[in-house]
């Protein structure tokens, strides 16, 4: 064997080794697990992220995602209970496969498990829902419930068929309906919108009227309260004036009563003092003093009796008639007072 043949052989061996190494070395991305098939049989040991070596041309692998992924189901037909065929353009199913369930699910449903467990189930559940409801319910009334109903139905079946596969969310686009029906629905929605606008305007008008009524009531209540306060103020002023008048009257009455009591007490004391003071002897003394201070001389038979007592007057009358002597005796004139005797003597 010459050198040329040896070089060709070495090059062929190196190329074969390189091809074998290239075919045996593979890379697994983060968030994925690799499952291996050897001769068509699934191996029990999945591999995690990184570089791995396998027997080329004998062992094959499939990468299975274990993080959140979104599967899309497109153009799903759906027949309503009224016989109208509608199409849902796209349904998105967000799901996640747990790493511990990878081997069982791949063994039971292959690495394309989402086609069996999600796509087919979506078609079945959606047709069940549409066939039980009318177009009005599917398109308008119950459309907001389709997402949640599909999610619950899928998760319920997966809990039995494929534990470890979890449905996180389901998003359904608006169904496509026949053009004529769509226009009718649009007109109906437009009329409903107008009705809602009219109802809202009516509510606004009613609210404004209610607001005005409340404002009027509040204003009336305010006026009434102000009037009530003013009335109470006037009543209090009148009551205060009445109270002041009563106090003044009571004070005046007390003063007058005290004054009357004082006058009564003074009069009573004065009467009592006079009672004790005006004795017959004192009166007699005062009479004599009054006669003594009187400088008038009376002549004739009409001498007032107040200046002489009865016995003196009788004696004086007898003297004037001549029954007695022309000059009265000293004893007869003695009660009349000393001044009267002196006056008589001066005129005789």
Swiss-Prot record:
Residues 339-348 have a biased composition (Polar residues). Residues 29-348 are lumenal. The keyword Cytoplasm does not apply. Deubiquitinated by USP25; leading to stabilization. Residues 1-7 are cytoplasmic. One of its GO terms (molecular function) is ubiquitin protein ligase binding. Glycans are attached at residue 108. Pfam families: Band_7. It is a single-pass type II membrane protein. Residues 321-348 are annotated as: Disordered. It is found in: Endoplasmic reticulum membrane. Residues 321-333 have a biased composition (Basic and acidic residues). The modification N6-acetyllysine is found at residue 269. Keywords: Acetylation, Cholesterol metabolism, Endoplasmic reticulum, Glycoprotein, Lipid metabolism, Lipid-binding, Membrane, Signal-anchor, Steroid metabolism, Sterol metabolism, Transmembrane, Transmembrane helix. It comes from the Eukaryota. Coiled coil: none annotated. GO terms for biological process: cholesterol metabolic process; ERAD pathway; negative regulation of cholesterol biosynthetic process; negative regulation of fatty acid biosynthetic process; SREBP signaling pathway. GO terms for cellular component: endoplasmic reticulum membrane; protein-containing complex. The chain crosses the membrane at residues 8-28. Belongs to the band 7/mec-2 family. Component of the ERLIN1/ERLIN2 complex which mediates the endoplasmic reticulum-associated degradation (ERAD) of inositol 1,4,5-trisphosphate receptors (IP3Rs). Involved in regulation of cellular cholesterol homeostasis by regulation the SREBP signaling pathway. Binds cholesterol and may promote ER retention of the SCAP-SREBF complex. This is Erlin-1. It comes from Pongo abelii (Sumatran orangutan).
